[in-house]
């Protein structure tokens, strides 16, 4: 069925009324009166558990949210994506990052062309190159083995590889991986400053080979290699992830060191493509294929599971409920896993660049809120930074906890148990809170004077009823990471379909780029700031004065 705008609008209205009527809903009371709440409001896929029972929902909420998914034609749009239809309507492109991890023998067609053989060919070339670097068969210009790789990219060409490389550090048995993204010269200076050009491979990740930040850093790295080893050495110390073969060749990189991808792969969905080359070099082709396999397992689940049993659908529906119905403008991603420290930033781009839109696919203003602000840090660090606001602040911010049942360090299992206890405690504390009477009783138990009890007790009250959901998997390995990231990709898709927006363009990044190009000669003093707004003129004048001081 097609998207039913009338039914969708009516269901949203029902949800808003339902929320208004159930706003006093007390989760503590709900858990006491309903012993089956966890079983009804959780789903599993193999070892991956998704628990949303600590969100402020009931059976009526769940029924209405399912109606919403049907009215938005989530299933139909999902089928269109997997079929290679041009669902990115503003750029007239297919959206097929799922093909990058499709290990089946089925055809995946884009405009009548089966793309799977192309995907396999690039993946096999990546594997051969990675094996050569890792084994030492492919050496630097001086004959030394490559010990370090530097990936130069930005946005999707950086955030995904950074996140995955850190997350899978227990599986590293190849060269050390470093990442440079910022145009700030400090980033590349600090990175190259600790490396030896003779044992370093630089990967330039830019589809067009024109991204200003990436190419500026690439030229700096090129000069670093050429100054140390000579111009002739450049080719042996660079590789590229790009489709601009002429520009890559002009830079000095041979075609057999260039790995491409396709316009049906968006940057924030590209870690599965040749953009993942630094990950593959770090962990090896075999584990990289497990990473892809984990994502594919979630793709199959998302594609085939019915709505009521579909983890990605319900993660998306709960996200929509929190944002558009409850009015929560922020979403905190809290992995209780230090190796997932960069996951919140990765999901920040995935979600905010996809769903940070204010017009529908038809170019009309949206009728309500769209994507939330996404942020986070690992637990337990966050507990000692911003959890104060999450527990006692005036804004309600839903949390999404991510944790593994088992850690990698067997000799530190007692510390992992402490980590697990903290994760569960935060989830429970947000839900339960602490009443004024409970705070008084706790203080009285410490034999404080009555006056002191009354003075301090209000400060120890926690309102509770603050929503959180929890994702638990067995262990953070390549398969589990791939599955987790794909889950969030599909969650973003589901939310976008209900919002009625295109999750696969990012026009919002363009205006600032255009103005930066205009302002560069103004900042450098080659052109006047005349004609610009008074604030910009004042800032330019101040910068000119301070740079000369």
Curated annotation (Swiss-Prot):
EC number annotated for this UniProt entry: 5.3.1.9
Q: Does the keyword Isomerase apply?
A: yes
Which Gene3D superfamilies does this UniProt record tie to the protein? 1.10.1390.10, Glucose-6-phosphate isomerase like protein, domain 1
Name one molecular function that GO assigns to this entry: monosaccharide binding
Catalytic site:
353, 384, 513
Annotated pathway, please? Carbohydrate biosynthesis; gluconeogenesis; Carbohydrate degradation; glycolysis; D-glyceraldehyde 3-phosphate and glycerone phosphate from D-glucose: step 2/4
> Which HAMAP family does UniProt cross-reference here?
G6P_isomerase
Name this polypeptide is given: Glucose-6-phosphate isomerase
This chain is encoded by the gene named pgi
């Amino acid at each position: 069925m097609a998207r039913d705008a009338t039914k969708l609008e009516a269901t949203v209205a029902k949800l808003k009324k339902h929320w208004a009527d159930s706003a006093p809903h007390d989760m503590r009371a709900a858990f006491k009166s309903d012993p089956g709440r966890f079983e009804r409001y959780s789903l599993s896929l193999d070892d991956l558990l998704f628990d949303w029972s600590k969100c402020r929902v009931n059976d009526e909420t769940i029924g209405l949210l399912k109606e919403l998914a049907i009215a938005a034609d989530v299933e139909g749009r999902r089928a269109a994506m997997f079929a290679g239809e041009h669902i990115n309507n503003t750029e007239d492109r297919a959206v097929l990052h799922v093909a990058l991890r499709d290990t089946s023998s089925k055809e995946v067609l884009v405009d009548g062309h089966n793309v799977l053989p192309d995907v396999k060919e690039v993946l096999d070339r990546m594997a051969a190159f990675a094996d050569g670097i890792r084994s030492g068969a492919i050496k630097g210009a001086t004959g030394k083995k490559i010990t370090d790789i530097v990936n130069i990219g930005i946005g999707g060409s950086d955030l995904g590889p950074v996140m995955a490389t850190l997350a899978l550090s227990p599986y590293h048995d190849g060269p050390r991986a470093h990442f440079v993204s910022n145009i700030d010269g400090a980033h590349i200076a600090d990175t190259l400053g600790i490396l030896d050009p003779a044992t370093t491979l630089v990967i330039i990740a830019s589809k067009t080979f024109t991204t200003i930040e990436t190419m500026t850093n690439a030229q700096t790295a090129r000069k670093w290699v050429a100054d140390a080893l000579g111009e002739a050495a450049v080719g042996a110390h660079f590789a590229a992830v790009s489709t601009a073969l002429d520009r890559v060749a002009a830079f000095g990189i041979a075609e057999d060191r260039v790995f491409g991808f396709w316009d049906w792969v968006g940057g924030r969905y590209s870690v599965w493509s040749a953009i993942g080359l630094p990950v593959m070099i770090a962990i090896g082709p075999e584990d990289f294929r497990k990473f892809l396999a984990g994502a594919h397992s979630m793709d199959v689940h998302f594609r085939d599971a019915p709505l009521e049993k579909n983890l990605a659908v319900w993660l998306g529906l709960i996200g929509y409920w929190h944002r558009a119905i409850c009015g929560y403008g922020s979403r905190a991603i809290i992995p209780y896993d230090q190796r997932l420290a960069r996951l919140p930033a990765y999901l920040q781009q995935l979600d905010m660049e996809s769903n940070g839109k204010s017009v529908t696919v038809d170019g009309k203003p949206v009728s309500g809120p769209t994507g939330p602000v996404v942020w986070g840090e690992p637990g337990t660090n966050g507990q000692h930074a911003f959890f104060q606001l999450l527990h006692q602040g005036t804004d309600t911010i839903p949390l999404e906890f991510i944790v593994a049942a088992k850690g990698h360090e067997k000799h530190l299992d007692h510390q992992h148990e402490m980590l697990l206890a903290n994760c569960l405690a935060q989830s429970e504390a947000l839900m339960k809170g602490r009443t004024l009477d409970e705070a008084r009783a706790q203080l009285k138990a410490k034999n404080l004077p009555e006056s002191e009890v009354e003075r301090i007790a209000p400060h120890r009250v926690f309102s509770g009823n603050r929503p959180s959901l929890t994702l638990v998997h067995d262990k953070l390995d390549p398969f589990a990471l791939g599955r987790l990231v794909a889950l969030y990709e599909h969650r973003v898709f589901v939310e976008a379909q209900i919002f009625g927006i295109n999750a696969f363009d990012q026009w919002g990044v363009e205006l600032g780029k255009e103005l930066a190009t205009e302002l560069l000669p103004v900042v450098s003093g080659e052109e006047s700031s005349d004609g610009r707004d008074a604030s910009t003129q004042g800032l330019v004048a101040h910068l000119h004065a301070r740079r000369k001081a």
